[in-house]
From Swiss-Prot:
Belongs to the DEAD box helicase family. eIF4A subfamily. Keywords: ATP-binding, Helicase, Hydrolase, Initiation factor, Nucleotide-binding, Protein biosynthesis, RNA-binding. ATP-dependent RNA helicase which is a subunit of the eIF4F complex involved in cap recognition and is required for mRNA binding to ribosome. In the current model of translation initiation, eIF4A unwinds RNA secondary structures in the 5'-UTR of mRNAs which is necessary to allow efficient binding of the small ribosomal subunit, and subsequent scanning for the initiator codon. It is an enzyme of class 3 (hydrolase). Its EC number is 3.6.4.13. Residues 249-410 form the Helicase C-terminal domain. ATP binds at A81, Q82, S83, G84, T85, G86, K87, T88. eIF4F is a multi-subunit complex, the composition of which varies with external and internal environmental conditions. It is composed of at least EIF4A, EIF4E and EIF4G. PROSITE patterns: DEAD_ATP_HELICASE, HELICASE_ATP_BIND_1, HELICASE_CTER, Q_MOTIF. This is Eukaryotic initiation factor 4A. Pfam families: DEAD, Helicase_C.
Amino acid sequence: MAGLAPEGSQFDDKQYDKKMQEILTEDFFTSYDDVCESFDSMGLQENLLRGIYAYGFEKPSAIQQRGIVPFCKGLDVIQQAQSGTGKTATFCSGILQQLDYGLVECQALVLAPTRELAQQIEKVMRALGDYLGVKVHACVGGTSVREDQRILASGVHVVVGTPGRVFDMLRRQSLRPDNIKMFVLDEADEMLSRGFKDQIYDIFQLLPSKIQVGVFSATMPPEALEITRKFMNKPVRILVKRDELTLEGIKQFYVNIDKEDWKLDTLCDLYETLAITQSVIFVNTRRKVDWLTDKMRSRDHTVSATHGDMDQNTRDIIMREFRSGSSRVLITTDLLARGIDVQQVSLVINYDLPTQPENYLHRIGRSGRFGRKGVAINFVTRDDERIVFDVQRFYNVTVEELPANVADLL
């Protein structure tokens, strides 16, 4: 699979590296090289430390060692690290350290691309700030506007949300921006893509001119970095080069499948062979989610499914069942990949390969969370060879053929 580029390969890694190098050599960033190897050495409030340790953290991850303190100092930051390395706790800690808890007004706004991810951030923020008495609320689509207005009127310190609902709350003046001093974009590559870019600008225009901005993502294409220049002031750059994006701890394999129609049999064979704690299966369309779910259930496999056409309440119930372990197999699409944070996921299967190399990391980063071992298996037809080639070049990894002893790896 790692030979010459297949005909029609779209990804130009030389052009990517050239654009990235141009941006990184410009006098746009502030250098910051301090590393804190323990949470105790970061100068954090005692009650924040209590929340961090109660959450289960013992030692800061690499991004936390470098990223929490500059954010706590009020500096603009751009931080890039692999999914599952503690980015969320990095900016949550930075926000919680700086809040004025005597002022029950929104002081920090966090935007995420999906409802599930926004709700996940809300949970982390609330857990880390448990001993501080933080008031945090998620403003997301698919929930009651009136309830959002009621909670915001009663007073919150932090709002986490999706761009559409947050902009609506600002426009209705239910969310007052006067005291917002911190603005965070999570999964910024997605947030700064064409779909969200205009909404982000519209929201930013309504915020105070003097505001701290944090940009966090697993991947940071040059286009996203260029956009950040419009609303950041000499940010601290904690940026991993593309060839340093680690997928360490996640073993990656491919299975050659001659025909699309044979994927289903291959998948069912795998599930009959392997003892799996929990797994996520990715396909590329909502219709395919429904189709594959029906096919697997008809063969007596217990699976759950979630996609953007389902109402929010149904998706919440399904994700709760999956997190609790009562459901062990989840079929979903890229849209919801970023809201899945389940520690026990040991296997990700790309039934369909992602159309963009950047999405590969977001998908397989669902396994091997926080240093645990994980396995990713990619179903590859002849039409998919170009995508696998692009992924290998993009992340500087080798995807090997699935060995016969795959059961020993899980």
